[in-house]
Amino acid sequence: MTIQTVTDAIRYVGVDDNTLALFENQYPVQPMGVSYNSYVILDEKIAVMDSVDARAAEEWLSNVAQVLEGRNPDYLVVTHMEPDHSGSLMRLAQKYPEMKIVGNAKTFTLIKQFFGTGALSEDRMLEVGERDTLSLGLHRLRFLLAPMVHWPEVMAAYEEEEKILFSADAFGRFGSLERTARAPWAPQARRYYYNIVGKYGAQVQALLKKISALEIKTICPLHGPILTEDLGEYLRLYDLWSQWKPEEPEGILIVHASIHGNTAYASEALKSKLEGKGAQVTMCDLTATDLSYAVTSAFYCGKLVLACSTYDGGLFPPMKEFLEHLQTKGFRNRRVGLIENGSWAPAAARLMRTKLEEMKDVHLYETVVSLRGALNQTSEAQMDALVAELCAE
């Protein structure tokens, strides 16, 4: 990735990764890729803001050296210790032995865990706490602890002179800068938020409260583009997402897990009936869609219909895994309808209900559509009743 000028004194030195298949070894990021963002603040003293994944170390070190133009960095500020951001930390520390590492107490605990207790001498560790500052000359960083957004050591850094928020993983987005330069921010930022950060909405709210008093002109996250325009919209979405509120309160998502096609056919029939009533409906086939997209869509809409076949007396595995992911990510504040299928002993509705009742503020529609194979007159009447409930609000 080409070095970018953020301001006269601040450079982007991050690296695009267009070969990674799975982010965190579970979320598909092809063909869009992902970026590992890092920045350099050039002043009387020089601060490097975070490192990158070890797989991108060589390009990153070259970028940093090019920006330094023979100078040595004074500080490496570590806002997040997850390996995609700390994987090259020790490479820079070894290259510049006089450079101090800036972090909070939990940062240094994790450095010792990842790199060994003797990786850094005590005199190279500069520990900061809430609202502590670090002067670089004209520029000054103020630190805001953001525990569990989404790791315990996370902190943001606010550069007071140019009013830049270095936000760690907050406001991040899937997609390399090269491949997604013209892509809208929200779709992959939404997917990133709900699957990576989403469980920790309360902690995100705490960070949003801290930064609400700041004048922010630029947000520099650790993944995705630097944000400079319409910051109010990014903040609005993060506020909405972190309260688990739907972006489309009346939107209906039908999620189906069908073995031989009858449950999928019933889902299509439901979609057609709802659209005939003017409803906004989206479909998701769990047997053909990555869970990260299904989870994101479930949070986007205010209403959800789950259609699942019974399998070995339990839930068809794609639906079981989907519900487990929803619960892990804090799914709440939604209304849910159920469609089950079981040729001789349908149990899916009961099992889905049990799982949903463990979630906060999830309200189930009264009508359950119960299939015994294919949709018939009886189950279609149930479907009509469910349509009436879904469209009554």
What is the meaning of each model-derived region?
Residues 1-45:
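Zn-dependent metallo-beta-lactamase
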Residues 49-51, 73-81, 100-104, 165-169, ...:
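Active-site neighborhood of phospho(di)ester-bond hydrolases with catalytic His/Asp-centered motifs
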